[in-house]
Amino acid sequence: MKKLLLAVAGLAMVAAAPAFADPAQVKFAYPSAPNNALFQGMQGWTDDVNKAAAGAIEVKLFPGGVIADNSNMYDRVTGGVADIGFAVFGPVSSVFPKTNVGTLPFEARNHREDALALWALYEKGIIKDEFTKFHPLAFVVFPGLVIHSKKPIHSLADMKGMKISVEGRVLSQMIPRLGAAPISLQPGELYQSLQRGLVDAVPQGWPSVPTFHLDEVTNFHLEVPLGFNTGYVAINNDSYAKLPPAGKAAIDKFSGKVFVERLIAADDTMQAVGRDATKAMAGQTIAQLDPAEEARWKEAVAPVTEEWVKATPDGAHVLAAFRDEVNAVRAAK
């Protein structure tokens, strides 16, 4: 009888014990295919966060535009369809006028300088007021723009009359000053637009060549410091606020500057892969402007920066602060 009572008591204790709660699900929307180092960087971040959260949350990546693409990522994240999203700023550049400082021509020399300087502006509160609708976890700056074209470009004269794709306000203002016509396109539209002759050239970083197969529709690649495409990784405000403490601590630990640096390393890899692969291909030509011609290009687009300063709230201060941060990154290297 005593054994029976003990067994019944044991069963009662098991029944009364609380079940372990399932981890809170966090949907991370990724706009393109999972086939490059940048996605691997996002996956590495996801794995580190999940491990550190120890079951409190489970971040899951949804690549390939399943939840959102570059054109609607901002709305999907701020609207809560996705908890976290990565996308380029281009489609919503008007929402982030100060943050567009990272896209200006002839400022930072490379994506590392640009990304770290831009994140420093956010951390110091200089551009933070633009991020009220979601919580940024990192900024992404893609390797510097290269003009991928069907015909060679050696000078401003060669640009005259060309139709060139643009993303974002700054590039849209810059291209006409170089004598070409801007055509607004999303990254996923580049290949077919080149193939059909809707555009003659596309300014994109080297990683875009293998990602969008640009080598199949262009043969000439001009490296000129026309600025950078920038992007964000951000979490919905409500999703962030509702995270269990261990989940929030895990996300915070691996976000910010450390996440920016992780994505810089991914971009380094993609730039090398894209450029090296293109260089090795038959029929592909990589070129740079001579110093005198580059100076003419810089002079031609200088009004874009001047206009940006005038049109942007506190623009002069933001640009000066950005230049200070770029110089600080450069000096610390």
Q: What are these model-derived regions, one by one?
A:
Residues 10, 21-113, 122-124, 129-333:
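N-terminal secretory/targeting leader peptides
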Residues 14-18:
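N-terminal signal peptide c-region/cleavage motif recognized by signal peptidases
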